[in-house]
From Swiss-Prot:
It is an enzyme of class 3 (hydrolase). Signal peptide: none annotated. It holds the Pfam family Lactamase_B. The active site is at D67. NCBIfam families: PRK00055.1-1, PRK00055.1-3, RNase_Z. Zn(2+) 2 binds at D67, H68, D212, H270. Homodimer. The gene is rnz. This is Ribonuclease Z. InterPro entries: Metallo-B-lactamas, RibonucZ/Hydroxyglut_hydro, RNase_Z/BN. It comes from Bacillus cereus (strain ATCC 14579 / DSM 31 / CCUG 7414 / JCM 2152 / NBRC 15305 / NCIMB 9373 / NCTC 2599 / NRRL B-3711). It catalyses: Endonucleolytic cleavage of RNA, removing extra 3' nucleotides from tRNA precursor, generating 3' termini of tRNAs. A 3'-hydroxy group is left at the tRNA terminus and a 5'-phosphoryl group is left at the trailer molecule. Its cofactor is Zn(2+).
Length: 307
């Protein structure tokens, strides 16, 4: 599991930062990539990374401001042009379906793979399978905006091979049956319960990716006990009132959410273009005063998420 930040700027592109897009690489977990937001030029940013459009399985849109969606039609079309055939699902607020349909129709872009668009109308679980589930809550922004909590389900513990070998059980198909939790009878009549030969489960990871938002309770709830919290930091602490007026957060407010939620790690993104060069480091300094394990994303930077 690895983050690749494709765009970390706020509102409009700048020389140093493109607009919002984050790839969550799940190559080991499911051989796929999930994308969060897709601002203009996202597909161009992808060219500089290991992300492959054909591997993008899901796209989660936080809200419908242009700096978060204007790259979506182009990416959907290019995925088809490049031979993508596997299904892709886009999740987002009401209106995302119309945006995609109109953009593809007017440009006569033909997508040759199954494309599903799921409009989120209620908070709660928007996706679940055997490996992950994704929950969402409304944030505090000028238009409807969602944050996403990605939960990896606990992974089954390893088979206690050494314990079986000590008992004289030889490797073979029986090992698989025991790992599947079956009750197995050996040739000598010994009964083995597979559940007694499985180690403790490995706890799954929790990732929280928030859209644009003021400081709010929903952010804390989504980030509770997260291994990684990705939070916007459009403004410095001295501009807290301006952040509030424009429905955004300061770096210090992001750190406060991480602290309250008992998150393990905070990554700041959505940085205003007013912070050019190394001036963005002031945002990092302010956040670390409150939450030490804070990093600030830059375009094309990767962040592994350890188990």
């Amino acid at each position: 599991m690895e983050f690749v930040f494709l765009g970390t700027g706020a509102g409009v592109p700048s020389k140093g930062r493109n607009v919002s897009a984050i790839a969550l690489q799940l190559l080991e977990e499911r051989g796929q990539t999930w994308l969060f937001d897709c601002g203009e030029a996202t597909q161009h940013q992808i060219l500089h990374t290991s992300v492959r459009p054909r591997r993008i399985e899901k796209i989660f849109i936080t809200h419908l401001h242009g700096d978060h969606i204007f790259g979506l039609p182009g990416l959907l079309g290019s995925r088809s042009f490049q031979g993508g055939t596997t299904p892709l699902t886009v999740y987002g607020p009401k209106g995302i379906k119309q945006f995609i349909e109109v953009a593809l129709s007017v440009s006569t872009t033909h997508v040759k793979y199954p494309l599903e668009v799921v409009e989120i109308t209620e908070e709660g679980t928007v996706f679940e399978d055997n490996e992950f589930y994704v929950e969402t809550k409304r944030l505090s922004h000028g238009i409807e905006c969602f944050g996403y909590r990605i939960v990896e389900k606990d992974i089954q513990g390893a088979l206690l091979v050494d314990k079986l070998l000590e008992m004289g059980v030889k490797p073979g198909p029986i090992f698989k049956r025991l790992k599947d939790g079956e009750v197995v009878e050996l040739e000598d009549g010994t009964i083995l319960n597979g559940n007694e030969f499985i180690g403790p489960p490995q706890k799954g990871r929790i990732i929280t990716i928030l859209g644009d938002t003021r400081y709010c309770e929903a952010s804390r709830e989504l980030a509770q006990d997260a291994d990684v919290l990705v939070h916007e930091a459009t403004f410095a602490a001295e501009d807290e009132q301006q952040a509030y007026d424009y429905f955004h957060s300061t770096s210090k407010q992001a750190a406060s959410i991480a602290l309250q939620a008992n998150a393990k790690r905070l990554i700041l993104t959505h940085i205003s273009s007013r912070y050019q060069g190394d001036t963005y480091k002031e945002l990092l300094k302010e956040a670390r005063e409150l939450f030490s394990n804070t990093e600030i994303a830059t375009d094309l930077k990767s962040f592994p998420v350890e188990k």
